Amino acid sequence: MELLHLLLFSWALSAHLFLALAQRSTYIVHLDKSLMPNVFTDHHHWHSSTIDSIKASVPSSVDRFHSAPKLVYSYDNVLHGFSAVLSKDELAALKKLPGFISAYKDRTVEPHTTHTSDFLKLNPSSGLWPASGLGQDVIVAVLDSGIWPESASFQDDGMPEIPKRWKGICKPGTQFNASMCNRKLIGANYFNKGILANDPTVNITMNSARDTDGHGTHCASITAGNFAKGVSHFGYAPGTARGVAPRARLAVYKFSFNEGTFTSDLIAAMDQAVADGVDMISISYGYRFIPLYEDAISIASFGAMMKGVLVSASAGNRGPGIGSLNNGSPWILCVASGHTDRTFAGTLTLGNGLKIRGWSLFPARAFVRDSPVIYNKTLSDCSSEELLSQVENPENTIVICDDNGDFSDQMRIITRARLKAAIFISEDPGVFRSATFPNPGVVVNKKEGKQVINYVKNSVTPTATITFQETYLDTKPAPVVAASSARGPSRSYLGISKPDILAPGVLILAAYPPNVFATSIGTNILLSTDYILESGTSMAAPHAAGIAAMLKAAHPEWSPSAIRSAMMTTADPLDNTRKPIKDSDNNKAATPLDMGAGHVDPNRALDPGLVYDATPQDYVNLLCSLNFTEEQFKTIARSSASHNCSNPSADLNYPSFIALYSIEGNFTLLEQKFKRTVTNVGKGAATYKAKLKAPKNSTISVSPQILVFKNKNEKQSYTLTIRYIGDEGQSRNVGSITWVEQNGNHSVRSPIVTSPIIEVW
């Protein structure tokens, strides 16, 4: 019997080890193309032959899904390599083959979930819109969850013929045929082999570029949607919706499906976009914190930059914690999210005649007129459905809810209690980003809440009337940084201040699939519509992409770095009260680690005067300085053989400055020098003088203090020195250097921030 137990145990152990070795995963594999043997006709031939050689050299094994290694995608534009399903033994064999650089497991990617053209001061008579022809013939790629092609935002009224340089396709699939593309939506493709490699039993319910989520449709219409008249979000924000670049061409690459969102599919989408000839890429997805050399968005964006394509990416919605930012690589345009000057309201009229404009997005014309209002400390915590159920005549009663710090839970409980309406007292900035408001009611601030409570306490029969579906413009202050917008510095590389720019991202009206539920009334009435309000840096990134696209149309010779520089150095750090832009998290002045250089100003970006340009070699020099292993360097840069590392430099020619200091004893000590080179993109000769604003407890100096340009496209360099001395209690401090044109109109501003490194890690 003991022998039998021993044999059974040995068999079980062997089976367990076999399954562990045989278990396959999808890997992203980076190869050095310079080492591709001459026998292969192209990269795909090399990749498929590599997998075939693995099959021949490694004993066959079967896991739950796969009986052999399998090639998923071949990549050659934004990176060189492939994705493949491999066991650990097969991966080990692959590592021994010529050209192998690195490999890491496929991972999931997360989404970072109108009036804004007016707020951005875009107009048809002057500035960036007419100068760029509204972005005409620039091709913007939106990598997301697909598109709803029937939307009015994607009709091609007024669009000329498709540019001949376009190489992409309109790929047919489920509920999507090639005729659904047009002169606006010139391309639609989809990528889901990574999902199927992860689990071949999955049934892709919408195997096409059609959007069943809404995120992609919304983002695409923000960046380049055509003019769509007479739209609104259930009566809020009524008017004409239009994208930032309404005459730009859209190419949609769906890599995010209901069944999953994988890195291998994302890379394939970006690789194809660059091959198709797009000018700009907008992506509103990111990862949790991972190293730069495993961040596929950063790696693929580096490859896109090398081919002259700028990537605009969302900073993420994990704010307001310091260092919470995604997509902060030096070659990416990283976009933060801000509130605009538009607010949505319901007017609260008390029985004594006092009118208060409360915040509301209740999606219907509810009839709340002269209804009784009640308030008591226990009930008005609004945290107990049981207590609220004891309210007499709830269908005709308005309850006041105190601020208990959990508005969403209060709204859920109020809705389930089926009360007539509620008056919520809250100053939580998160409340004013959500478009979900299923129960009649308004949100008022604490001061207004006291007025309402005093009225109720001092009235025998207190009543109130609430009207809904109201939209107001020119709210002050605006813009304001959204509390959820992720903050820098970037964990990818601390030496550059990120994010780069602030763009509209809170309650943005844009297109949406009409068969996807958008909001609700009560607990069981689900509503859908063609246009909805959404919030997040996901909405900010396509705004920036649309502006960048128009700058590319107006200045086709500008590099990705020049476009980003123009947007940053002309950004406005002040709000519409001409005071520093505030952070809605703490109501204090925002820093460059919250909002970048400031709020994007498209018309000023058209004519920035000077730009901080950077070549692909400049980014390579930066990578050379980061003490990466050869494997890590080549994973990003593809091949060390094709790059020169003789001049490594961590000081990239960037239009912002960050100095991170360490704490030594009771004092912080810092002295850091930066070298910058600016290019004159004005009309001709010009002279600029430096205007300095030092961060608190700092001195800054610049040499030379005057830059003289004799010709357009001439370059001049300067050195900025920051010296900081302070006690350990000091935190982030802000300054700036502005090059002011003498006898001219240009003002070229770069933010400066000093911050203790201990706050990041």
UniProtKB/Swiss-Prot annotation:
Residues 756-761 are annotated as: Necessary for prodomain cleavage and secretion. Glycans are attached at residues 177, 203, 376, 697, 745. Residues 574-598 are annotated as: Disordered. Residues 23-112 form a propeptide. Residues 1-22 form the signal peptide. SUPFAM superfamilies: Subtilisin-like. The active site is at 144 (charge relay system), 215 (charge relay system), 538 (charge relay system). The record marks 38-39, 52-53 as: Cleavage. Induction: Expressed in response to mechanical wounding and insect herbivory in leaves. Not expressed in uninjured leaves. Residues 575-586 have a biased composition (Basic and acidic residues). Residues 26-110 form the Inhibitor I9 domain. Optimum pH is 7.5-8.0. 60% of the activity is retained at pH 11.0. No autolysis at pH 4.0-9.0 in the presence of 5 mM EDTA or 5 mM CaCl(2). Disulfide bonds join 170-181, 382-401, 624-645. Has the potential to be used as an additive in laundry and dishwashing detergents, because it is a calcium-free thermostable subtilase alternative. Thermostable. Activity is unaffected by heating to 60 degrees Celsius and only partially reduced after incubation at 70 degrees Celsius. Disruption phenotype: RNAi-mediated knockdown results in partial loss of resistance against M.sexta larvae, impaired systemic induction of late wound response genes and in reduced levels of cell wall homogalacturonan (HG) and pectin methylesterification (DM). Propeptide is internally cleaved at Asn-38 and Asp-52 in a pH-dependent manner leading to the dissociation of the propeptide from the catalytic domain and resulting in the release of the active subtilase. Cleavage occurs at pH 5.7 and to a stronger extent at pH 5.2. Its main location: secreted. One of its GO terms (biological process) is plant-type cell wall modification. It is found in: Secreted. Homodimer. The mature polypeptide has three domains: The catalytic domain, an interposed protease-associated (PA) domain required for homodimerization and a C-terminal seven-stranded jelly-roll fibronectin (Fn) III-like domain. This is Subtilisin-like protease SBT3.
